[in-house]
Amino acid sequence: MSLQLNGKSRGTSPGNAQPLPIFDALCRSLPVGTADEQFWWKLTGRHLARMMLEAGYPEHRQVECLVFHRFKVVPTFGPQPRSAEPWYRSRVAASAGDGAPISYSWRFGTADRKPYIRNYIEPLGPLTGTAADPNNDVATRAFLQDLTTTLPNLDLSLFWTFEPHLVSRFSDKADREKYAGPSVLTGVELSPDSDAIDIKMYLYPRNPEQISQLLSTIIPKAMRDAYGEDVCLDSLNIVKDFLTNHPDGRQLKPRGTTGIDCCKVQDSRVKFYVATDNTSFDHIATVMTIGGRRPLSTEVLDKLRELWYELNGLPSDFPTSEQVPTGQGQELPAGHHGVGFYYDIQPRLALPDVKAFINVRKHAKSDLAAAETVISFLERHGQGHHNPRAYLNVLRDIVPAEELETRVGAQAFYSVAVKKEELDITAYFIPQVYRRFASVQVELNGQRRSRFE
């Protein structure tokens, strides 16, 4: 029996029948809002509630984050889906997404840090997708302005300094139409042990010429504007030298995205994203160590290789210098094979921090196989103290078990960083709003929409 949401069915999850008491209580108490808001709340609010419950968030924090999500985030998602084709294709989750304006991440945690959750969103508004707002800036600006009255820890000064350098502006109508598309995304971090909600911004220039100039001119100029003319650019210059002069570095392609934290300027990261075609482990290890400038222990490199091989189904004696074979019948898009990285080039770091991103659709047989591989790896290496298997309950709340076992698509990436000799792993996944359109309608409403609706 489905629960009632102010007289309307709350719906059921596709594969996890365990109750969500805090979410259910809020559904009974909060204002209904518009039909569009109710759709997004019933879907994404339930997902968020499941994530926080499984991650062991304190009850008061669950309430706080859910109320913030309902009244600050949900209204930015725009019209609910009317078909399997999005009315506006968001850049959230990039090529792994289905056009929905939200995705999620689950950080499994390390010995000294509990699991925690982020949402990644692209606010949508009345001008989104129109000639008046070709890069969907207006809704994001309105959202950020709203947050300044809500989040006392929010500091947007670095974002507003970087934004004019990194967001493309076109005076010519033909160029505006040619390069129309999302240019800014927002990350919403919900830590379990904090009363703050942290905001991250991701900027993407639409003009390809700008992407090629990011490291050489655009980001250095933005950093001088933000930090002063005497800002230390050592980390940036190390990455630039690696990409320019090292054989493995020259294989990296800038993705165009620059990520920054909306906190005190001196504490913010500046993340520069790249990707590669080369899937050999030797290449991946070289990129992670920046050509040996940021050395990793043999133990850590062995763990990285073990995880990479297991995700790809490779035997333990597979040569580290060889490319991962493309599976028979597996179709891969042109360009990189699903391995990306970011370098944190903030001024206070003598050496950049590095994180790798592994595309699940290109490096795993199924969503469940990928999740089981990562969870078993964490348990085997003594990182099971935060119950990583709780993540499976989150996936089952989004996608039925049979789909998890046979398909890829619910998960976008796994990221891997190194923290104190441990692998710090995060899963990135999407709510399947459009990819599972018909099923989502059944789960939320209890009946299929008419094909003519």
Curated annotation (Swiss-Prot):
Keywords: Prenyltransferase, Transferase. NCBIfam families: arom_pren_DMATS. Belongs to the tryptophan dimethylallyltransferase family. The keyword Transferase applies. Pfam families: Trp_DMAT. InterPro entries: Aro_prenylTrfase, Aro_prenylTrfase_DMATS, DMATS-type_fun. It comes from Aspergillus fumigatus (strain ATCC MYA-4609 / CBS 101355 / FGSC A1100 / Af293) (Neosartorya fumigata). Pathway: Secondary metabolite biosynthesis. Coiled coil: none annotated. This is Prenyltransferase nscD. Prenyltransferase; part of the gene cluster that mediates the biosynthesis of neosartoricin, a prenylated anthracenone that exhibits T-cell antiproliferative activity, suggestive of a physiological role as an immunosuppressive agent. The non-reducing polyketide synthase nscA probably synthesizes and cyclizes the decaketide backbone. The hydrolase nscB then mediates the product release through hydrolysis followed by spontaneous decarboxylation. The prenyltransferase nscD catalyzes the addition of the dimethylallyl group to the aromatic C5. One of its GO terms (molecular function) is prenyltransferase activity. Dimethylallyl diphosphate binds at R118, K200, Y202, K271, Y273, Y428. GO terms for biological process: alkaloid metabolic process; secondary metabolite biosynthetic process. Its EC number is 2.5.1.-. The gene is nscD.
